[in-house]
């Protein structure tokens, strides 16, 4: 089963609105409100499909007009704030000294207002960072991805700091590289030798048991040379 989602929203806080299309939970394109053009998540999508950014901008303008009308005729009771769930993980298997990307996945929050900061050893990082637009999640909530290009090191630790109206305080989600444990060459040799000895012992025991079984068999036809 495949699912496509078309998200349009307008709100009184930044970002003031968004128009985005996704397929099977992956963004296809969104409309940049400042540049007034469609931004394709992958360049290949732009060669396969045609989208008029003006249509998305018109939809956002209509949503803003409807929002103002709703505010004027409502009792001004805001929807409850839903705090986000946050996890941090690397894009690729971690190898110390090899370039990688950290992913901060922020999910199931409302409204779509976030402040996200990457920290390395407790200090803000601004280089090598990128992010998606707000994506659709379950029950009219939102999700978002923030990325950090980095080189894993045993000396560095990272945090994804998320601020949201549903949180009493900024939420820090920690990540640090776990250096793989490598056995010394001598230890590997000993383990290999022990494995060989155990294997040979198993073969010897098997031969002895088979020989005893054949000798104790009452059927003379079973007594054949090995």
Swiss-Prot record:
This is RLA class II histocompatibility antigen, DP alpha-1 chain. One of its GO terms (cellular component) is MHC class II protein complex. Glycans are attached at residues 75, 115. The lineage of its organism: Eukaryota, Metazoa, Chordata, Craniata, Vertebrata. The keyword Ribosomal protein does not apply. It comes from Oryctolagus cuniculus. GO terms for biological process: adaptive immune response; antigen processing and presentation of peptide or polysaccharide antigen via MHC class II; regulation of immune system process. InterPro entries: Ig-like_dom, Ig-like_dom_sf, Ig-like_fold, Ig/MHC_CS, Ig_C1-set, MHC/Immunoglobulin, MHC_I/II-like_Ag-recog, MHC_II_a/b_N. Keywords: Adaptive immunity, Disulfide bond, Glycoprotein, Immunity, Membrane, MHC II, Transmembrane, Transmembrane helix. Residues 1-189 are extracellular. Residues 84-176 form the Ig-like C1-type domain. Belongs to the MHC class II family.
